[in-house]
């Protein structure tokens, strides 16, 4: 996917108080009455809100070209909220709005535009509160207590649309074909756009647009739409609306990375007790699923999710590869998600105090230089010198680095426990101290053998049990490995108490936890080890690593580990640093169907979809960045299970597919071996 830096919109304001794009020299909405124009062109043009009451599915998907000020979205949101109040028993319960924007507005420009529509204020305020960073790709916003999903794709719509995953095909119920006038923005109004609209459109899906330009009408007709000219808004003579009478036949370009949905969502079991499992439960519940959670321990977050303080910051590089794309978006989503949970009243220690990554040696300095070459927005990451670092952090590390202003720390153990309590209030059934010793496919789903010997049945199973995800016959070929880590808890003192920023070097040091009056310093990283015992040598190594990395920081010498206070956990990691999200692939069937058949020289004209275990899913291998990746990973998995549009491009989703290691070899004609 193209990852050019996203530029914000440059605005001016005309005599009527309407925002004007300096990039396109065109108004964002009608000088006459923007709100009335939106209701007439896009809502009435697509038979909204009347259509809500007869919609046959629980979710309605609307796509839009050109988010702009968000006026179309906010107006539709208002209409949907009124509909839900008037018809709470209607089939339609969820609105999924997908919009594309090449030049997103800044928050203060949004606020100025939104001030013109007081009746939309409650919706506009919530939108601005969650307004994402200017990063390329999809930003998923969960609004209206989960009843509205907004997927904001930042970038060129004609670049993004061909890179959407196959799961987006035939999903869109209505198109808002907006954007600046074709004469002002000809690069957007192309045959490629119209054909992509048809590909994504559901049978009898509709569209409406303010323009009646002949080439637009002809392009939509050639793409398969039935097009009608109707009276335009206000003084405008004509506009276009229409529908797609039937869906188009589509061949997947990458069937080996298919993402099957769950056959049912009435009965889902999750195996695990950490942050990934609990956030997955919440994501599924928000969609109406019935979920049971099985945790082998007597309390949640006893594994890698159980630390007192964990740093939240992204994993970036200058290549804008799948790692960088995923973690940049995941970081922003995680920050919004955790803030939203806190606003809901969940109690967990956290501070959005910023995180600084230090250039403590030549290798780390080169890495930081490479990150800065990626031209990331300063709201995400900014270069800082030693003097700035001292001012930000309260202590002088004696080195330069970079800062993630929206980063910080939180208590994973408290977050997991609070989120689990919320899920239970929402109807989650929890079985603690209940290990699952066997997993067997049945005609109706899956049979789980529990630790006490009894057997229970569930239609769908999600594996989210950390480094134990490869314990099952169905997952034993997956390449995840265990990594032991020990975090030291050190008492604060007058010097360390001045630290107000998370510092990352060849380890990390957090500000003081007000609750415990300790700092966390860590962590050891022992690949292939899964023991949970305290080790004095690792305690010493945690302190020594700080001293070695920051030899000129006298304050580091005040770190006291003599109390031998620490916590041990075991992570599950992969060599490519990305998690496993999706259906569990069937190893034997993958080799049987794909071996010697995926290399371009031997590939048949048609290739079957990837073999997988039906109704068995996985979210795992989150490694040491689980706080960053877990919220978006859970959202992706829940979306896949519900056959919803997914919030990532095709290539990034492929890089998260649990079968990716085997498929990469098979595509190159190499043998697949299991270590």
Curated annotation (Swiss-Prot):
Residues 1-245 are annotated as: tRNA (mnm(5)s(2)U34)-methyltransferase. HAMAP family: MnmC. InterPro entries: FAD-dep_OxRdtase, FAD/NAD-bd_sf, MnmC-like_methylTransf, SAM-dependent_MTases_sf, tRNA_MAMT_biosynth_bifunc_MnmC, tRNA_MNMC2, tRNA_S-uridine_synth_MnmC_C. One of its GO terms (cellular component) is cytoplasm. Catalyzes the last two steps in the biosynthesis of 5-methylaminomethyl-2-thiouridine (mnm(5)s(2)U) at the wobble position (U34) in tRNA. Catalyzes the FAD-dependent demodification of cmnm(5)s(2)U34 to nm(5)s(2)U34, followed by the transfer of a methyl group from S-adenosyl-L-methionine to nm(5)s(2)U34, to form mnm(5)s(2)U34. It catalyses: 5-aminomethyl-2-thiouridine(34) in tRNA + S-adenosyl-L-methionine = 5-methylaminomethyl-2-thiouridine(34) in tRNA + S-adenosyl-L-homocysteine + H(+). It comes from Pectobacterium atrosepticum (strain SCRI 1043 / ATCC BAA-672) (Erwinia carotovora subsp. atroseptica). Its EC number is 2.1.1.61, 1.5.-.-. This is tRNA 5-methylaminomethyl-2-thiouridine biosynthesis bifunctional protein MnmC. Coiled coil: none annotated. The gene is mnmC. Its main location: cytoplasm. Residues 271-675 are annotated as: FAD-dependent cmnm(5)s(2)U34 oxidoreductase.
